[in-house]
Amino acid sequence: FITQPSLTKMVRELEKEMDIQIFERTNKGVHLSKDGEIFLGYARQVLEQADLLESRYKKKAGGKQEFTVSTQHYSFAVNAFVDLIKEYGGDTYDFSLQETQTYTIIDDVAHMRSEIGILYYNDFNKAVLHKIFKANDLEFRELFVAKPHVFLNSDHPLAGRKSVTMDELAPYPYLSYIQGDHNAFYFSEEIFSTVVRSKNIRVTDRATLFNLLIGLNGYTVCSGVIDQKLNGASIIAVPLRKEGDMHIGLLTHKQTHLSRLGQAYVAALERYIKGLQG
């Protein structure tokens, strides 16, 4: 147990020692400063590394490894996460894989709640996203470039085509992921989000999207990367005849270095990407 005055004194001494202001204090209360957010991100990494050392060399009972990824809805991100846990999970761990909205991914990495983010940019949103990356001291590292595809139900009337056009898709419901309060086209997870469509359905998760694809003969525009082991054979990817590239990659904070688990996860991602390209 520690008293409030003692805690306040310790924080002020830490601020003095580190020569930074961790908290901003006003008559409305106390909140983290920008330097404070970065400091806590570093501190979190140090504590996690210390736990790993104790767990490895002192056989500390109950010591948990922690690791968090925020990502758009990509099956290869899940595949790599599975591999990471199988190889490094051990008996105790606390890992998080968050399939979430684009802005949340950026915010999670910027505030070091997630070590790694996974998202894409294209010619349309590149300038806006990279400006946000720079403002938040984030670094984007490209994993691969994907050509546009659509996900369809395997029984869809267009499923047998070698490729499809936007005009051919027009009669069918278009599905996309909700982007919450930041629903600008620049944050859309789907390329060609500015195209006007007569039938639109927005969802929050991949399972619902796939169920609606099957139930309504809908479609969504995507990278074309799908794993039948995870998603079954009822969803297929068909090339879309429309010019555009999706640059899919990793988002990390420039003020941190990847942990051992982060490095292992990136290696697992790269193995899957190599398999896609090979």
Regions found by a protein language model. Give the residues of each.
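A short LG(V/I)-centered, amphipathic sequence patch enriched
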Residues: 13-32
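Alpha-helical linker/hinge and terminal dimerization helices associated
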Residues: 17-18, 39-61, 67-68, 265
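Flexible hinge/capping segments at coil-to-helix
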Residues: 61, 132-174
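Central regulatory/effector-binding core of bacterial HTH transcription factors
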Residues: 64-128
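Secondary-structure junction motif
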Residues: 77-83, 122, 126, 166, ...
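Hydrophobic hinge/microswitch elements
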Residues: 108-115, 120, 179-236
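Beta-alpha-beta core module
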Residues: 135-141, 146, 207-257
